[in-house]
Amino acid sequence: MASSCDDALVSDLEAWDRRTASQLERAYLAAGAGPGGSGSSETSEGAWRAKRQHLCVPMDGDGTWLDVGCANGHLLATLPVWCAERGITIEPHGLELLPTLAALARFLRPELADRIWTGSVMTWTPPRRFTYVTALDDQVPPGRLADLVARLRSEFVAPGGRVIVSSYTDSNGAPRPLFDDLSDAGYPPDGRIHIDRPRRHPLLSAWIDA
């Protein structure tokens, strides 16, 4: 029975990864460099910063950082710059599900090529631990958030580090109750960020200390 359950869970994750690939790969590759190739519908750098610079808030000390789902690597290039403005040094690393996007990220950021890996967050084995790990709640199927956070805490994050989970929606999506979802999963946030935006759904991020 346990083996059957494990097989079902693996199949569930593999199907979710295939769904993610089918939804994102073509659009992200077509967008190429810049914010568009990292999932932003607005391609200006100002809009990109407004959407993502809040991720610097939980990075309150020097350290290494893994971006799960790094796409074309644009956040790997920009977030350390924003942190440096606050006097904090962040060494970026990336994990990307799609080999084509990981290859694009390595091409666009050759200085980071040896720090950008390809794999699924629920099966990939990290070569080291990181001070900070950022991930999205939709990188696993609904109901699997607890598994995602547990794996990131046990295998990805260094002692004293932080798992930072965000929930983003497009203009037609309904906001997800990220903070409640984390609490229900057994991981009440140690910190929360809720940014309201005119005529748009809020930006939500939360962190869990390791």
Report residues per predicted region.
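Conserved alpha-helix/loop element of class I SAM-dependent methyltransferases that forms part
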Residues: 45-62, 78, 82
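A short SAM/SAH-binding and catalytic strip from SAM-dependent methyltransferases
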Residues: 132-145
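A short glycine-rich, Lys/Arg-flanked "PGG" loop and its adjoining helix->strand segment in the class I
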Residues: 146-159
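Class I SAM-dependent methyltransferase SAM/SAH-binding core
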Residues: 74, 78-113
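Conserved SAM-binding strand-loop segment of SAM-dependent methyltransferases
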Residues: 111-121
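Class I SAM-dependent methyltransferase Rossmann-like catalytic core
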Residues: 21-54
